[in-house]
Amino acid sequence: VGAGALVIGAYLPSTGALARSAAPIASGAAALDANAFVQIGADGVVTVISKHTEVGQGVYTGMATLVAEELDADWAQVRVVAAPVDTNVYKNLAFGFQGTGGSSSVANAYEQMRRMGAMARALLVQAAAQSWKTSAQEITVQAGKIRHAASGREAGFGEFAALAEAGRVPAQDARALSAAYHYLQ
């Protein structure tokens, strides 16, 4: 009876510095940094910044689903990146430090990520209403498209990302009612 193994290791000294300094970058040139957790590129790609680490338990899918639901994003246009090291912004609300553990990720971030997606949607709706010179109440969002039924106008998220960047964050909670959900059941 015999056994063998090949183990190869490497030391990458710059990895830690890179993790501390690199901020997630949205895929488009004119991005909407709606908040610390959601960016929208000029190309319409929604980048969700996850404060929880993906180690095979599906955290990235969970974070993306929460944001996509509230934003009413096209799932094919959603991606997830790891949050940079910043405990003040990305801490686990249950533990007080930036980390993942104790099966707490989705429970910990559920309301927070929903609010962040809703905030991004509200900023896009405000931008569309401003551009189309109409009321925000007349604007709808569905599957990554912003629409004004009365005029027949329609645009993707990316078309309003830069204008939404200058918008004011809505004072009231804009989260969707669960009856309107597509991804969360």
Predicted regions: what is each one?
Residues 1-185:
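Cofactor-binding beta-sheet edge motifs in enzyme active sites
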